Amino acid sequence: STELRQTGKPHFLANLALALISAAIAGALFLLVLLLIEGWRLSPIGAAIVVSVMPLAALLGSRLDRLVPSARARAAAGAILVSGGLGGLALLPRAEVALTVPPQVMIGIGLALVLSALTETALSGRAPQAIHGGWTISARHAGVVIGILAVTPIFTHDIAQQRHDAINAGTAVVLDSNVPPLLKLDLAQKIESRLDDEKGKVPTIGPAFEPLPTDPEEHDQVVQLHEELQDQLNRGATHAFSPSFGLAALIGLLSLIPIGLARRVEL
């Protein structure tokens, strides 16, 4: 068995890596839930079902760690997988739930590998274990706070900018549509009212198109216009999250520095 040595000094590099990777993971969960609910307008239950892919993948990853005895290799592989998954979320081409599944699988497996390896390293050969376990928990909690604080200002700025760009693009869609002029004017006023009511958010424009015209031709034109506008808004919302996901991926990659610098054979 491993001989424990009485020391109050925590494993600085392992805990630093834990903080950085926890910041990246917090960014992943926080941003993905916001994207699904506020951007793509999924229900909270629907969003919860979608993000459940991540913990399920983590269960798979917990089985894979037995195949890699080196804690350093597991930590590095896990950090790369987490960052790669975040990079995939940053590059989502459109609002489609299925496209979030592969990046989530990468993040979940990476999470299991890196957290187990770094926690094992931070505690290895140290006593009392309760004290050093507390250091690992503190590092992870600090990372969560840092991650959310890091991505929130970028996300807030970008969602406002993308909202503005999507509105401009949507205006062009309305003007170019085949909807009769009077109906087009009425829709424009309703859409503007919806935008004013939901400043600072990705707007929900569905109510602006109700009630739908009874004339079959106008009905089809309005439905098509609604779909085109919603597509513009969804695309804008998706792109608004890209820089924040990218920052979270970069934070995850930074954890490779303390992992690589650690001199202990266990890492």
Question: Model-predicted segments: where are they?
Answer:
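Aromatic-rich transmembrane-lumenal/periplasmic boundary elements in polytopic membrane proteins
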Residues: F155-A208
